[in-house]
Amino acid sequence: MGKIIKSLSRFGKKVGNALTSNTAKKIYNTIGKAAERFAESEIGSAAIDGLVQGSVHSIITGESYGESVKQAVLLNVLGAGDEIPDPLSPGERGIQTKIKEIEEEQRNELVRIKYGKEIREKFGEQLEEIYQFMNGEVKGEEEQEEQYKVLCKAVDSYENLLVTENEQMRTLARALQREATERTENESKMVKEYRQKIDALKVAIEVERDGMQEEAIQEIAGMTADVLEAASEEVPLVGSGMATAIATGRAIEGAYKLKKVINALSGIDLSHLRTPKIEPTMVATTLEHRFKEIPDKELAVSVLAKNDAIVANTKEIKHIKEEILPKFKKIMEEEKELEGIDDKKIHPRVMMRFKVPRSQQPQIHIYSAPWDSDDVFFFHCVSHFHANESFFLGFDLGIDVVHFEDLAAHWHALGAAQEAKGRTLNEAYREFLNLSIGSAFTSPMHARRMIRSKTVHPIYLGSMHYDITYETLKTNATEARYDEDLQMHILRGPLHFQRRAILGALKFGVKVLGDKVDVPLFLKNA
C-alpha cells in the first residue's frame, strides 16, 4: 500500500520563482538585460506559449530544453466523435457512451451475419442457442430451457472465446520474437498481415503528427471507425484479418450478446471485461520510430501488453465460474425450497444477492468536492472483482496538488478474499482536503470552502470504463503524479481542457516527444 502527496508542475512556475529569487541577479548577468525584459513582460501577460515559453524557461532557470515545452500526444487513436469528455460533465460522457454502444452493436451484428457459420463451427452451436434466448421468438413453457443452464453455457462460451484469443495473441507474439527464417508458414502469414496493418496505422499517425502544433497536448484523430478496427486488431479468431468487419473475441462476444445474457440471468455485470481497440504502447512505439521501421521485438511487446488485458479478463471469468456460480446455484436452490419457484426460472431475488453497488464496480469513478468543484476533484479507480484492489487519485488545480493512495479492498458478493489493510475512500478524501486547507498557497476563501466540503460527502459524478489493465491504469496514475514534464503539458489551457487532459493521461497515457530545437538560433531571431 502506498500514499504519495506531491506538488504539481506547471509552465511558468519555476520561471516566476527564478525572476524573484536571490539568484536572479546571477541569471540576469548571464542572459543579459534584453532577454530579462523580454521574459518578464511575456510572463507578466501570461502570453509565453509553445516554443517561446520552452526556450525562455530553459534560459532563465538553467534547465535543459528537454525539460521544457515539447509535443505531447495522447496514446489513443480517435475515431469521429471519440473526443475525451470532461470528467465533471456526466451528460457529455453519457451521450458518448450511448453513441459508442449503438455503433458497436451494428458492427457486432455485421460480424454475426458475415461469419456466423464459421463461428458456430469453431465455438459450437450453443452460441446460437444463447443468442436465441436473448433475441429469439418466445417459446412455450415446456420448450423453455432451464435458465441456469443457459447462464452456464454463456459463461463457458465467453471463457472459451477468451482462452482462444489468448492463445492466438501468444502465437503472434512468439512469431514476432523469432527470426524470420525460423517461423512456420502460418506464423509468417500472421506476421505479414500484422505488419501491413501496423504500416497503415503508422502512415495515418504520421499524417496527423505532421499537422500538429508544437504546443499543448494533442490527440491523433481522423480515422473512421472501420479503418481503426481493421488496423488495430492483431488476430481474428475467424475469417480474414484484413477485412473491415473482423471477428475478434470482443466482436463475437458482442454479436452473440454473452455479457448481456449473463447480466440478465444472474445480475452480474461484466461490462468491465474489455480490451483496448488499439494498445497505447503501440501508438507510443509508432511515434518513436518516425522515420524507421519498427523492430519485430518491439511489436511483440505491444502484442503482449494487449494480451495482458485478455489474461485479466480470463481470470475474471474463471473467478465468476469457479467461485461465484456455485454460490449462485446454492442460493437458487434455497429460494426454490422457500418460495416453491418454478425449476426453470431464476428468481429476481437471487440476482439481487449478487448485485454490486455502482460505486464499487470495476470502473473509474469520478467525484468532486461540493465547493470549488471545478478545481477539486478525484478519481476512485477499481480493479476487476478477482483482484479486489482500488486507488485514489485526487487533484486540486487551485493550488496544484496531486494525492495518490492505495485503498482498502471492498467487501461485496463478487469480491475475492479480503485483506485488512489500507484506508477507506472517505479517509483518503478527507486527508486530501486537509492538504488544501493547510497549504501555504491556499487563499482564505478556498480554505473555508474545503473545510465546509470536508463535513459532507463528495459529489458523485458517475463512472467510466477503462480498456487497459488495472496495472497499466495505476502506472499511468504514477506518471501523472511523478512526471513533471508530463504535468507541465497536461496542465495548460482552460480548466475543462486540463481535466480532459488529466483523464486522457490516466486512461491512455501520454507520450511527450523530445524534438530538439536550436535554442541559440531561436534567441538570435527572437
From Swiss-Prot:
Entries under Pfam families matching the protein = Orbi_VP5
Its GO biological process annotations read: symbiont entry into host cell via permeabilization of host membrane
Where in the cell does this protein reside? Virion
GO CC term (a single one): viral outer capsid
Keywords, sorted A to Z = Capsid protein, Outer capsid protein, Viral penetration into host cytoplasm, Viral penetration via permeabilization of host membrane, Virion, Virus entry into host cell
- Extract the GO molecular function terms from the UniProt entry: structural molecule activity
Task: Give the chief site where it resides.
Answer: virion
Q: Which domain of life is it from?
A: Viruses
InterPro entries attached to this UniProt entry:
Capsid_VP5_Orbivir
Question: Where are the stretches annotated Involved in membrane permeabilization?
Answer: 1-42
Which stretches are transmembrane?
Answer: none
Of which family is this protein a member?
Answer: Belongs to the orbivirus VP5 family.
**What role does it play?**
VP5 protein is one of the two proteins (with VP2) which constitute the virus particle outer capsid. Acts as a membrane permeabilization protein that mediates release of viral particles from endosomal compartments into the cytoplasm. Permeabilization activity is probably negatively regulated by VP2 and is triggered by endosomal degradation of VP2 and exposure to low pH.
Q: What is this protein called?
A: Outer capsid protein VP5
User: Can you name the source organism?
Assistant: Bluetongue virus 13 (isolate USA) (BTV 13)
Which gene does this sequence derive from? Segment-6
